[in-house]
Structures are given as C-alpha cells and as structure tokens.
C-alpha cells in the first residue's frame, strides 16, 4: 500500500510515516511500555497484570489487578474507564498511604508507553471509551461556616460508618470492608493531612463524585449537590488542623482553594 502511494504521490509515503510516528508517540508505544512495565511495575502488579507480583504477598494493601480496567483515580464517572491523563496522574503522583509510589523518575514518553501497555491487560480498553469528564465547579472557598455545613453532610451520608466520627478510619464497619477482589481494606484516615488521590481540593471533590472503583468508597454524584460536596471537602480538610490552616491561608489569593 505504501509503495503504491509512493508511486502515485511522491513524498506522500514519507508523510504517512511521519503521521504514523506522531500518532504512536501520542498514544504510547506498547512494545517499549512492556519493557518499562517489566522493569518498574511487574514486581508488584505481576507479569499478567493481575496484581500478584512477587512483592504483593508482603503488602497489606494489595496492588491493583489491571484485568478488569478498574481504577481508583479517575476524572470520569463511576464504572467508566479512566482517561490516559488519569493514569498518568497516578503514575506521576502515586497514591498516598499505599505502596504505589510516585514515578516522576520516568520521563513523559516512558509514562505514556507504560500506560499503553497496562491498558492491554483489560479488553475493556479495546471495546469501550471513557465517559465524559466530571465537571468540577469553582471552589467557593474554605470557611468556618462551610466546615460546619460539611460536618452535617458527613453525618447525613453516614461517612462515619467507615471513616469514624473523627475521620480516623475507625468506624463501626472499618474491619468488615473488602475490595472487589476480596482483600481486606482499612478506611482511610482523613486526619493525616494528605489524601490518597491528591491533596488539591478538586481531587477530594472528584473522589466524592466519582468514588474509588474497586473499593467500598461509592460515588455520590447522583445524590450530592455541588454545594454540599464543597462543604464536605472543607470539612475533610478541617480534620487535619495544620492542613486546614494552610488551605485557609491560600483562599484570599487563590479562590479555588487549591494549593499551588
């Protein structure tokens, strides 16, 4: 085909090669991604992407099984596949409180390539497309009034059942929780001052609306208003006094409430 195009349109074949290379670079190179995966990821996630690498048995929080295409951090609705940018977010930032570290040591190309390879473990990526990104409205700003309202939201949605009245992960159901693969889970301690999927206020908001797929943490997008969600974000931030103080100090110059 390429030879025929070259005869009919001199120079076009070279252009197609350039375009093809650009597309490969944009979507990631699976072959190179496999090499990156084997070097950095396989010891935990396994050679089949099943979360059963050699190191997995020593981990209290088990590595993710990639075969179902189920990921904790997503900008898409519950049940949807993540975007490539979501997977890159996890690679770049890690998941605080788990064994998933940051992989800032990897350059952008390597991250893109390993994402392309990881996606081959689940047939969902070949047959489905991610749903539209969850829209996050502007943060109205951290305030004592918002924290008070957020405490009421925390009670209304029974967050204390898992996370405990003080947010320390010691609720009545804390010892009964398991992930989709039957592994024991401990609810996150919200008083640590760091949040598993990112410290930005938008990250916390997103978790409320998207949930954490594969875990008992549900999505509240169908029942939680954006105003209540922001109040709940501010309440969660208030559980760690040092962190809340830092957030409050940024509001005047950064209305979104996000730390820069």
Locations of the language-model features?
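Bacterial N-terminal signal peptides that target proteins for export
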Residues: 2-12
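Bacterial N-terminal signal peptides
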Residues: 10-20
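Electrostatic cytochrome c docking/interface patches
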Residues: 22-36, 125-155, 194, 243-253, ...
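His/Cys-centered metal/cofactor-coordination and adjacent catalytic loops
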Residues: 24-29, 43-69, 125-143, 189-190
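Sequence/structural segment immediately N-terminal to covalent heme-attachment motifs in c-type
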Residues: 27-46, 142-168, 175-180
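Sequence context surrounding c-type heme c attachment/ligation sites in exported
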Residues: 31-39, 148-160, 198-203, 210, ...
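Inter-heme linker and motif-flanking segments adjacent to c-type heme-binding CXXCH motifs
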Residues: 50-51, 97-101, 117-133, 145, ...
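Extracytoplasmic electron-transfer domains, predominantly the class I c-type cytochrome c fold
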Residues: 57-104, 111-114, 118, 176-221, ...
């Amino acid at each position: 085909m390429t030879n025929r195009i070259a005869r009919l349109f001199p120079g076009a074949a070279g252009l197609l090669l350039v375009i093809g290379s650009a597309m490969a670079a944009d979507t990631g190179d699976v072959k190179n991604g496999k090499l990156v995966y084997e070097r950095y990821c396989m010891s935990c996630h396994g050679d089949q992407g099943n979360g059963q690498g050699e190191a997995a048995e020593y981990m209290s929080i088990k590595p993710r099984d990639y075969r179902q295409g189920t990921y904790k951090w997503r900008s898409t609705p519950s049940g949807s596949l993540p975007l490539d940018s979501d997977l890159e977010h996890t690679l770049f930032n890690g998941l605080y409180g788990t064994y998933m570290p940051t992989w800032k040591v990897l350059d952008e190309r390597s991250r893109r390539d390993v994402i392309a390879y990881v996606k081959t473990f689940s047939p969902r990526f070949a047959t489905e497309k991610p749903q539209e990104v969850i829209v996050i409205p502007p943060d109205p700003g951290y305030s004592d009034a918002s924290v008070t309202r957020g405490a009421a939201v925390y009670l209304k949605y029974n967050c204390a059942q898992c996370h405990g009245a003080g947010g320390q992960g010691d609720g009545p159901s804390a010892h009964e929780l398991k992930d989709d693969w039957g592994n024991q889970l401990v609810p996150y301690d919200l008083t640590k001052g760091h949040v598993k999927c990112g410290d930005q206020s938008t990250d916390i908001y997103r978790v409320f609306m998207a949930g954490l797929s594969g875990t008992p943490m549900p999505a509240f997008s169908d029942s939680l208003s954006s105003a209540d969600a922001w109040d709940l974000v501010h309440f969660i931030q208030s559980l760690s006094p040092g962190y809340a103080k830092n957030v409050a100090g940024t509001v005047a110059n950064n209305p979104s409430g996000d730390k820069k």
